Amino acid sequence: MSAEVGYGVTNGKSAWDDMIDCTIETKPMLFVIHALDRRDGINTRAKFYRAHRIHLDQAERYNVDVVTAGTLVADDGETPVGSIFVVDAKDRNAVDTFARSDPYHANSVWETVQIHAYNKKRGTPIQSRRS
């Protein structure tokens, strides 16, 4: 005699129970932070560079994972004109808080900051490090 109790249930455990028991993988929710410097911001940028880097290293305090980040440069390939980040976060509010807390924002290096949700279509797969 089988231990089957009902449709899809064996030994008192259904297929649904197996699905509930599985570990849910967090899917990355990506955002782009696009920040442009003030025209006269190069000296201020240099002054707060170290604090900005520390802020990036501590992104997880804001529930944000920095996937990639870099300096936007003029066509000469060297002169900084802004910053760009791709971040993984639970929601836009976390990204906004993270961006507003950046020393470049707090010390007026950036003139404008835009945040956009980002739907990655190509490139290296991104696995969320958020729990």
Where are the model-predicted features located?
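Conserved, structured core segments of small domains
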Residues: 2-131
